[in-house]
Amino acid sequence: AIGYAAEANIPFELGIIRNHYVGRTFIEPTDQIRHLGVKLKHNANQRLIKGKRVVLVDDSIVRGTTSTKIVEMVRSAGAKEVHMRIASPPTTHSCFYGVDTPEREQLLAANNDTSEMAELIGVDSLSFVTVDGLYRAMGESRRNSNAPQYCDACFTGEYPLSLADRDTNGLPAQLSLLNEKIG
């Protein structure tokens, strides 16, 4: 957020106070727990927000639960406009390599384009970093599509290893020893 404010030449203020003792809400098992987690984790500073055009910056949008609740909170605090900027590309595919993301059909970006996501979340505008922009931020000139420098499957759907227990859409598939080739 500090970097975005500096590049956009707009003031940076702590309009949302974050409780650092609450963990990542997107990995919680139920909507009810995720919603409670968002309420416990974030509080709006109405004195700084009321009557202003606000730009929220977040690392990602997974289901959209946190984004939606934060936008509602900021609007309730009196924001005139709410815009959101995301520091990663849209998460369109599940991660099967250690990040506890939901099934693909639960990912907001898997089923909606950016304008639909903006409407669902309740923001006036929504923008994401592109895949190449993410690579530039990590010091690369761009993504090498023949041999990606990093795992970016959650953004591109191009998994570095085949998923033996998933079909081509990332849905659970029945494993079969009959399909396995023996060396």
Question: Which residue ranges define each predicted feature?
Answer:
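PRPP-associated nucleotide enzymes
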Residues: 1-183
